[in-house]
Amino acid sequence: MDFATAFAGLAERGEREATAPLGGVDVRLVRVPAGGEGRWDSHPDTTETVVVWSGEFKVEFRDRTLLLTGGQCCVVPVGAEHRGTSPTGAEVVLFTKGRA
């Protein structure tokens, strides 16, 4: 999967996100606008790996916040409540266990 090409395609189509299966993993590409705030979420049976492709992205947990920039990543533990926000806009790749 070519992330640069995929994000460019999303931008050209005016879309914010796309999800594709890849080797048993769901890969979700998200273009987060400046000031964008996601909803609180949790995953009861899988971790979620968050990779920031570009920009600044905050992964907020109930008890702490991680600020990530392009090229950085973190893993959201199974069951952890979290949400993503971006003060300046970001392109983010999310990896979770694929749906059976």
Model-flagged regions — what are they?
Residues 28-30, 50, 93:
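Conserved hydrophobic/aromatic positions in well-ordered beta-strands
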